[in-house]
């Protein structure tokens, strides 16, 4: 088994006295990540519509890219020849690549699952692709992100117990193969993923097995695949405290205000979600916990900033009326400006929670967001 790298450490700086929340610093070869922290998603080595310089201005520290999509286009060989994904996309900060498992398992009509891995047809050109734990790690080693994810089987949110039990057991066996295949433990941290669906005993069993492997970090997967918010919350509140306190904890695919606040309450450190850019591309702004449709006529003659408290380029430069005009005109700039703001908004939200944890006022300051979902 590859030895954990000294290049990756997690230091807890403060703990909330009324919850499991903690503020810390996750050190990587490309710099520190102050936690808790929201990570923007750059699926194809680009956060949609945003330049790396603009992304840095949002205070983003760590960015996620997608192994499955980059394998299909342009291919890991081209990215490796460029010097790795950081140089390829012009981003100098920490990066994480997911394993491609979630995307592969979403191709329900195009794939075949076996103990070796998943055989699927590329939705781009129809060619057969054999994605195994070894191949996923090989691709991620070539991409060169700081954090890489184990190849896992992500069962449907409402899958029956036998299906989830089998998927969870296979995820562990695949993790062991990922560890053996990992060629760059010195500069890439391999995180394991706790699966188990909505069955808390399976989550406990999976967490116990992963902890025994002493990995550099741990993720909770399978919580953004169609479950009700209350079920997601139940799983996170149960699972997060089981994970080692001296390692970073990552909740995959979650990025709403309440879900992040509740997860931080349980001890989660890192989040990723496509919400900021997806909403931006549909003319929706995230403003202090609310969703605003900038196409609405109410903004047509509103010359105030989108959010007077926000330091982002959009809010410091343009009015609601201008944004309304851009969205109504279907101008690309409108979608870009809203995406910039939305990314900044969710990063600021996790930054403000971090500061509240340092001040030990988290449960008071964010009580509104800590009510369990129904």
Swiss-Prot record:
SUPFAM superfamilies in alphabetical order: tRNA-guanine transglycosylase (SSF51713)
Function field: Catalyzes the base-exchange of a guanine (G) residue with the queuine precursor 7-aminomethyl-7-deazaguanine (PreQ1) at position 34 (anticodon wobble position) in tRNAs with GU(N) anticodons (tRNA-Asp, -Asn, -His and -Tyr). Catalysis occurs through a double-displacement mechanism. The nucleophile active site attacks the C1' of nucleotide 34 to detach the guanine base from the RNA, forming a covalent enzyme-RNA intermediate. The proton acceptor active site deprotonates the incoming PreQ1, allowing a nucleophilic attack on the C1' of the ribose to form the product.
Domain of life of the organism encoding this protein: Bacteria
Protein name as it appears in the record: Queuine tRNA-ribosyltransferase
Gene3D superfamilies assigned: Queuine tRNA-ribosyltransferase-like (3.20.20.105)
Binding site for substrate: 98-102, 152, 195, 222
Cofactor-binding details, from the entry: Binds 1 zinc ion per subunit.
Annotated EC: 2.4.2.29
Catalytic activity: 7-aminomethyl-7-carbaguanine + guanosine(34) in tRNA = 7-aminomethyl-7-carbaguanosine(34) in tRNA + guanine
Family under the similarity heading: Belongs to the queuine tRNA-ribosyltransferase family.
Active site, renumbered: 98 (proton acceptor), 272 (nucleophile)
Pfam families: TGT (PF01702)
Subunit annotation: Homodimer. Within each dimer, one monomer is responsible for RNA recognition and catalysis, while the other monomer binds to the replacement base PreQ1.
Cofactor: Zn(2+)
Region RNA binding: start-end pairs: 253-259, 277-281
GO molecular function, one term: metal ion binding
GO cellular component terms, semicolon-separated: cytoplasm; cytosol
Record keywords, A-Z: Glycosyltransferase, Metal-binding, Queuosine biosynthesis, Transferase, tRNA processing, Zinc
InterPro entries cross-referenced by the UniProt entry: ArchSynthase1/Queuine_TRR, TGT, TGT-like_sf, tRNA_ribo_trans-like
GO BP terms, alphabetized: queuosine biosynthetic process; tRNA wobble guanine modification; tRNA-guanine transglycosylation
Binding site for Zn(2+): 310, 312, 315, 341
UniProt pathway annotation: tRNA modification; tRNA-queuosine biosynthesis
């Amino acid at each position: 088994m590859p030895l954990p790298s000294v290049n990756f450490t997690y230091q807890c700086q403060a703990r909330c006295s009324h919850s499991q929340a903690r503020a810390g610093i996750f050190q990587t070869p490309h710099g520190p990540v102050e936690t808790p922290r929201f990570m923007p998603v750059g699926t194809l080595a680009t956060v949609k519509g945003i330049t790396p310089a603009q992304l840095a201005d949002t205070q983003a520290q760590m960015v996620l890219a997608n192994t499955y999509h980059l394998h299909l286009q342009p291919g890991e060989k081209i990215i490796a020849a460029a010097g790795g994904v950081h140089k390829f996309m012009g981003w100098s900060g920490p990066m994480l690549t997911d394993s491609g498992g979630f995307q592969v398992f979403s191709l329900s009509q195009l794939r075949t699952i076996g103990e070796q891995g998943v055989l699927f047809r590329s939705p781009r050109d129809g060619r057969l692709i054999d994605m195994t734990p070894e191949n996923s790690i090989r691709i991620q080693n070539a991409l060169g992100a700081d954090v890489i994810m184990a190849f896992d089987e992500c069962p449907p949110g409402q899958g029956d117990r036998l299906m989830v039990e089998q998927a969870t057991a296979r995820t562990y066996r695949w993790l062991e193969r990922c560890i053996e295949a990992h060629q760059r433990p010195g500069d890439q941290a391999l995180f394991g993923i706790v699966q188990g669906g909505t069955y808390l005993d399976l989550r406990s069993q999976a967490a116990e097995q992963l902890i025994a492997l002493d990995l550099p970090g741990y993720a909770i997967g399978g919580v953004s695949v169609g479950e009700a918010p209350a079920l997601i919350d139940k799983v996170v509140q149960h699972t997060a405290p089981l994970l080692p306190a001296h390692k970073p904890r990552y909740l995959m695919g979650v990025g709403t205000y309440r879900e992040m606040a509740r997860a931080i309450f349980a001890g989660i450190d890192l989040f990723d979600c496509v919400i900021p850019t997806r909403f931006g591309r549909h003319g929706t702004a995230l403003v202090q916990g609310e969703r605003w449709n900038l196409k609405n006529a109410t903004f047509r003659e509103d010359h105030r900033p989108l959010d007077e408290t926000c330091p982002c380029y959009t809010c410091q430069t343009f009015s609601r009326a201008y944004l309304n005009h851009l969205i109504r005109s279907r101008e690309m700039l409108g979608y870009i400006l809203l995406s910039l703001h939305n990314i900044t908004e969710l990063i600021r939200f996790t930054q403000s929670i971090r500061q509240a944890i340092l001040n030990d006022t988290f449960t008071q300051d964010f009580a509104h967001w800590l009510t369990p979902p129904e």
